[in-house]
């Protein structure tokens, strides 16, 4: 995959990026050892980059409610449903690391219904996939069912919001042709 271009569109050089975006990309590269392709691809549109990552961080970096591993679980399952290779691979790597379960991401991406999930994780995935597939079918009874299974309103909202946000992310990565970095494939294994 490494010979593939980062995007079907113009990709800016790091030196040409606004300083706040450049600093964020440099910080990510320092932590991970590489620059994820999505950062470079989205940096071509600075205002969208800022808005995208502000929403991403708001949903994915919360310390209350869903765990960070549960948040990544949603991303992997719904990205697989949306056929987004970038998000499956990138967030699969993060899921493996955060869950400390090296097989989980592959299981969920291939068939979430046969994955080795806890009851709580299965309820999260079932609800996320319903939002992904047919959000109009969500009823008051379905929300009450999630509540009866121990989910708070904030957790239910976050499952839906993460699913919706990554539908956007999946479509951006797919139409722009953003490939996953090779480094993601082996992380957390």
Task: Please annotate each region the language model reported.
Residues 1-189:
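Hydrophobic alpha-helical segments
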């Amino acid at each position: 995959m490494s010979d593939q271009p980062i995007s079907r569109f113009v990709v800016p050089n790091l030196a040409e990026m606004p300083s706040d975006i450049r600093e964020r990309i440099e910080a990510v590269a320092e932590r991970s050892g590489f620059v994820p392709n999505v950062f470079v691809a989205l940096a071509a549109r600075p205002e969208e980059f800022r808005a995208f990552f502000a929403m991403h961080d708001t949903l994915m970096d919360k310390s209350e409610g869903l765990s960070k591993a549960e948040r990544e679980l949603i991303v992997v399952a719904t990205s697989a449903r949306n056929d987004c290779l970038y998000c499956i691979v990138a967030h699969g790597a993060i899921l493996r690391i955060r869950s400390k379960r090296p097989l989980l991401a592959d299981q969920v991406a291939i068939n979430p219904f046969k994955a080795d999930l806890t009851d709580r994780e299965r309820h999260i995935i079932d609800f996320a996939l319903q939002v992904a597939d047919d959000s109009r079918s969500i009823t008051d009874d379905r929300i009450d069912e999630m509540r009866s299974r121990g989910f708070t309103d904030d957790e239910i909202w976050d499952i839906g919001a993460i699913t919706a946000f990554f539908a956007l992310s999946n479509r951006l990565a797919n139409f722009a042709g953003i490939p996953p970095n090779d480094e993601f494939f082996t992380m957390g294994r």
